[in-house]
């Protein structure tokens, strides 16, 4: 217990922790300002999708551009052209040689060749001329010829017909100019060229320079354009034009989809990067428009996403056209983001933030002291060695920090704070329970119990949030904001506090008639615990704990157990009424357990029940702290999420209070009836 510390060492540890919190808090304030200045979200839709929809929806492309603008779309994604795309849009005509021979007899036509002609419209002529230049660059001289037939220019290609139709031709300037006329921004999606040369990169930048509306580069496929040989050359052009590279969030929300070269470009370009959320069409069709909108909304506010790439549904709904169905769910996302305080426009690029090394060092010193306090609470006999332990830990961590081992040190201390904070908070709570253990419920009453529980909840919650600031202060930099680096040990932050609090609990409260003070006591406790008779009720309780454990641990992370539909509905409701949706294990489970644990204490219910309730509280406090380990989530959102959880937990306490009153009256009724008999 803290009260058993030598007075001087406790004062010194408390002072170091306080100074560290101030430094970590200042770093977190700087982080908040960086995040607060990057609140513009770019909403992107596929340009070709609009053209294809216009051709089958009895409307014009201009009308659909207007529809999507009103829904919130700010930008159109432009991809590499292919011969098939150009032919489908009516810009060129593609013939197999054998097909052309059947219509005309000319010795110049060969049956094993492909022939391309312009459609003789103004757009067709432009596309044909640009296609001619692209094919000349991409094909061997022997495989590409220009011939004239009946005063008409034809392109003769020696290639497999089917494969040629889908051959990437690069992004066309003509397409970029057409998109520019819509007034929307343009997101270019180039594919890599096999054995790319500087000429290929120059060709791409000539397309970029043809418009002033290019907002970002979002590579298509598994490699960045120019990877690997021309990546440095591409980087120079991107820097010169101040164009951000877009990184696509991975489907499991950890890191990014593999695109070789993109992280290198981002690192070397000073993190001039935008984080993008994209949902596959296969995933979209499983969701109704409201749920799809919620996915995009949540990804933006919770994961520093500043660009959304919207897919199209396969089928229309509610008697609308497909475009209207798509525009409706996009409009829903736009409305919710604007209500949350975001702007819609060209994507914000976060400042490449790295805090002062002096501030970071102070945060590390405080975090190390916090970990020392947690260790002393778990292993009390080490208290007499507190001075040397603190000095050794301080010197060791500072040496690592200043000698180039910063990365692993920061990860270790962040994990230590995520585990140590709930351990310290729960130790204080258990000390309070020990002091109140002899109080009888008849001297307190339900009203007093509720007020006491609320005050304890908020006291514990505030202490947990203060400890959580250490995680933010230690990890804060642009690499963590963008999730190029991630916090390691999420599962441990759930499990270790439970183990540590259990060890402290048996030193505070008597299991099997006595508290654990010495190592012999602990061995005796383990032996008695292993000799407990397993009854049906105990087996049922263990099974229940197993289910709770599956939910608690299995649902953590990004690939956890499935979430039932009723819980999804609850989540969406909370997202609508709160700035940040709190976690269910906090406000439905951990926070109300404070009230139940006090009731168990004052009513002198079985010790095992009080223990499980303390474990439940630990889960709630640990969850509050662990929230801050998700560094891609804005600092203010994590902070308000914790506060919202305390508010919701207080409300749920009222329901728990009513349930406890009813349960107590029922048990008293049957007890009195049994005694009379």
Segments predicted by a language model, with ranges:
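Hydrophobic secretory-pathway targeting helix
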Residues: 2-53
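Soluble extramembrane regions of membrane proteins in the secretory/endomembrane system
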Residues: 34-357
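Alpha-helical transmembrane segments of integral membrane proteins
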Residues: 2-23, 365-677
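Hydrophobic transmembrane alpha-helical segments in integral membrane proteins
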Residues: 359-363
């Amino acid at each position: 217990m803290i009260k058993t510390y030598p007075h001087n060492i406790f004062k010194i540890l408390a002072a170091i922790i306080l100074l560290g919190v101030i430094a970590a808090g200042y770093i977190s304030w700087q982080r908040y300002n960086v995040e607060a200045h990057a609140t513009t979200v770019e909403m992107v839709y596929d340009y070709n999708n609009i053209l294809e929809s216009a051709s089958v929806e009895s409307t014009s492309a201009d009308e659909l551009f207007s529809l999507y603008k009103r829904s919130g779309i700010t930008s159109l994604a432009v991809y590499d052209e292919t011969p098939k795309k150009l032919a489908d849009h009516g810009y060129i005509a593609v013939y197999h040689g054998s097909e052309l021979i059947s219509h005309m007899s000319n010795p110049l036509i060969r049956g094993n060749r492909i022939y391309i002609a312009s459609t003789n419209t103004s757009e067709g002529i432009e596309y044909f001329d640009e296609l001619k230049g692209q094919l000349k660059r991409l094909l061997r001289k022997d495989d590409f010829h220009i011939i004239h037939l009946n005063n008409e220019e034809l392109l003769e290609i020696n290639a497999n017909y089917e494969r040629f139709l889908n051959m990437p031709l690069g992004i066309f300037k003509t397409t970029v100019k057409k998109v520019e006329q819509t007034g929307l921004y343009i997101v270019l999606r180039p594919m890599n060229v096999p054995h790319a040369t500087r000429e290929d990169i120059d060709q791409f930048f000539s397309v970029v320079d043809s418009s002033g509306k290019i907002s970002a580069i979002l590579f298509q496929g598994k490699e960045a354009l120019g990877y690997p040989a021309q990546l440095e050359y591409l980087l120079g052009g991107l820097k010169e034009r101040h164009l951000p590279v877009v990184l696509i969030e991975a489907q499991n929300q950890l890191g990014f989809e593999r695109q070789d070269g993109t992280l290198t470009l981002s690192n070397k370009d000073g993190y001039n990067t935008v984080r993008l959320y994209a949902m596959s069409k296969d995933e979209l069709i499983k969701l109704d428009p409201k749920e799809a909108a919620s996915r995009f909304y949540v990804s933006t506010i919770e994961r520093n996403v500043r660009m959304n790439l919207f897919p199209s549904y396969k089928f229309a709904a509610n008697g609308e056209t497909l475009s209207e169905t798509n525009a409706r769910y996009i409009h829903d996302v736009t409305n919710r983001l604007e209500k949350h305080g975001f702007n819609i426009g060209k994507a914000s690029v976060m400042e490449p933030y790295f805090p002062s090394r002096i501030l970071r060092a102070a945060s590390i010193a405080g975090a190390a002291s916090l970990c020392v306090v947690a260790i002393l609470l778990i292993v009390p006999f080490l208290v007499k060695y507190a001075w040397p332990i603190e000095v050794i830990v301080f010197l060791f961590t500072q040496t690592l920090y200043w000698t180039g081992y910063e990365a692993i040190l920061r990860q270790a201390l962040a994990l230590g704070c995520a585990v140590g904070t709930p351990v310290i908070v729960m130790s204080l709570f258990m000390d309070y329970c020990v002091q109140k253990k002899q109080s009888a419920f008849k001297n307190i009453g339900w009203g007093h119990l509720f007020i006491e529980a609320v005050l304890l909840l908020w006291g514990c919650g505030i202490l947990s949030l203060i400890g959580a600031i250490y995680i933010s202060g230690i990890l804060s930099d642009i690499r963590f904001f963008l999730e190029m680096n991630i916090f390691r040990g999420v599962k441990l932050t759930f499990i270790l506090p439970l183990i540590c609090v259990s060890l402290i609990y048996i030193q505070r409260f008597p299991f099997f008639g006595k508290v654990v003070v010495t190592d012999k006591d602990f061995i005796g406790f383990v032996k008695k615990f292993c000799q407990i008779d397993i009854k049906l009720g105990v087996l049922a309780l263990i099974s229940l704990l197993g289910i709770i454990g599956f939910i608690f641990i299995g649902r953590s992370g990004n690939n956890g157990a499935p979430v039932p539909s009723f819980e999804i509905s609850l989540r969406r409701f909370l997202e609508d009424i709160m700035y940040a949706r709190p976690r269910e294990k906090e406000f439905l489970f951990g926070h109300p357990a404070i009230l139940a644990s006090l009731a168990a204490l004052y009513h002198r219910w079985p010790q095992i029940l009080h223990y499980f309730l303390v474990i439940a509280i630990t889960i709630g406090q640990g969850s509050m702290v662990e929230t801050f380990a998700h560094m891609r989530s804005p600092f203010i959102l994590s902070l308000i999420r914790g506060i919202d959880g305390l508010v919701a937990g207080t409300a749920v306490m009222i329901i728990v209070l009513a349930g406890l009153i009813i349960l107590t009256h029922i048990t008293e009724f049957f007890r009195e009836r049994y005694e009379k008999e």
